[in-house]
Amino acid sequence: MIEAGIIGGAGYTAGELIRILLHHPEVNLNFVYSTSQLGKSLYSIHQDLIGDTEIEFTSKINKEADVVFLCLGHGNSKRFLSENKFSEKTKIVDLSTDFRMKANDHSFVYGMPELNQEEIKNANFIANPGCFATAITFAVLPLAKNGLLNDDVHVNAVTGATGAGTSLSATTHFTWRDNNFSAYKSFEHQHLQEIGQSFKQLQSDHTSEINFIPNRGNFSRGIHATAYTKFSGELEDAKKLYSEFYKDAAFTFLTDEELHLKQVVNTNKCLLRLQKFGNKLLITSVIDNLLKGASGQAVQNMNLMFGLEEKMGLNLKAGYF
């Protein structure tokens, strides 16, 4: 069994990670570290876990664990790893932004299996992608692979309230979020950098703009993204490119039907739909921001790192009705 630990166990992504790992056939959840919830049962915070586990939040860290997931606030993972040294055998999966951009001062691999599967299999350190970055990158990556990303990409995406985390703020409060809709961080969202990095990895001469408008939706979870760019070929040409690129992808699927968040919420899937309007290709992408956009993808990466079947523990059912 893989001995797993979680650092920072009280948030939404940690909660989803706990749920997956508790039912993963090859994993034993060894510890969940949280100083703010020390001594409390996991189900006192993640209340749906009552009856599933008696594990308590702890301040003790097993530095010999096989894999450790970091569910810390952005900017805290670097400091945590500098203060805590793990065994050489321990694999690290970081769910923050801290290591997503390539740099000479770290050896983290960007953990997008559809892009870097072989590197992930051989990695000891994984930087898990962001939720918006996952939905948007999947929508456009096949174009970059074929050197066709030569014009500006325009993206409009809506995320559920869980994308903002558990900390309260004026824009996450129920009375403001309910029956409301708003844009934020237009053209300057932090995920733009990693999206551009992925495009450039496959199309080195990529210099066109990514015009991204993120929106807050009045629902709990999920991301619905629409992206469009110029495409000179026919719709069938685009479908062939996308089908070829994702033919071996464990969780990414193409459809000709209208997409709905309910098809993917509570799953690790990404669904894509292609449409052609004049000289523009429109790609719709839907994911669960907490699963394919965070914890599910993290476990998918873990499976690859340990040589397990990629979908193990992740055959999850959508809450369709």
UniProtKB/Swiss-Prot annotation:
Entry's localization field: Cytoplasm
InterPro entries referenced in this protein's UniProt entry, alphabetically: AGPR_AS, AGPR_type-1, NAD(P)-bd_dom_sf, NAGSA_dehydrogenase, Semialdehyde_DH_NAD-bd
Catalysed reaction, written as an equation: N-acetyl-L-glutamate 5-semialdehyde + phosphate + NADP(+) = N-acetyl-L-glutamyl 5-phosphate + NADPH + H(+)
Principal subcellular localization: cytoplasm
Pfam families the UniProt entry points to: Semialdhyde_dh, Semialdhyde_dhC_1
GO MF term set: N-acetyl-gamma-glutamyl-phosphate reductase activity; NAD binding; NADP+ binding
Class in the EC hierarchy, top level: oxidoreductase
UniProt pathway annotation: Amino-acid biosynthesis; L-arginine biosynthesis; N(2)-acetyl-L-ornithine from L-glutamate: step 3/4
Residue runs in coiled coils: none
Keywords: Amino-acid biosynthesis, Arginine biosynthesis, Cytoplasm, NADP, Oxidoreductase
UniProt EC number: 1.2.1.38
Catalytic residues (positions): 131
Keyword Amino-acid biosynthesis among record annotations: yes
Gene Ontology terms: biological process: L-arginine biosynthetic process
Function (record text): Catalyzes the NADPH-dependent reduction of N-acetyl-5-glutamyl phosphate to yield N-acetyl-L-glutamate 5-semialdehyde.
NCBIfam families: argC
Name the record gives this protein: N-acetyl-gamma-glutamyl-phosphate reductase
Species annotation: Christiangramia forsetii (strain DSM 17595 / CGMCC 1.15422 / KT0803) (Gramella forsetii)
